[in-house]
Amino acid sequence: MKIQQADKIWRNWSGSQSSAARIVQPSQISELQSLVKTHAHIRAVGAGHSFSPLAKTDEVLLNLDQFKGIVAFDQEKTQCTVQAGTRLYDLGKDLTPINQALINQGDIDQQSLAGAISTGTHGTGIDLPCISAFVEGF
């Protein structure tokens, strides 16, 4: 598990939020499970494109960047299972070989899929909901 330097400060993209927490980046499910078992307070962090203090903590910030890509897909249902740390800018490229695509996407594509889902990222169009509305399950 990668652990960021203790003196490193995490900041959101606008610089309006910051945190001096220990940032951890597990690469295996077992590391993630161990982290959850041994820490009472964990905040997930991605690209930091939220203005709200969602990631503000003095304890542990969890970065899921190593959990990326498509795990499984169902061509008939045009559904796929995607890992939480997948960045939106990679998701389109990942979906192309399986003839799938996002029906709608926000202007900014730096977010992780988990971040886009949890912060209400949306695209344009009166009839198109935010990305979270397309989630079938976790």
Which residues does each predicted region cover?
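N-terminal regions that are enriched for targeting/export leaders
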Residues: 3-12
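Glycine-rich N-terminal segment of FAD-binding domains in flavoprotein oxidoreductases
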Residues: 14-110, 117-125
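Short loop/turn motifs at secondary-structure junctions
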Residues: 9, 18-20, 134
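FAD-binding subdomain of flavoenzyme oxidoreductases
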Residues: 116-138
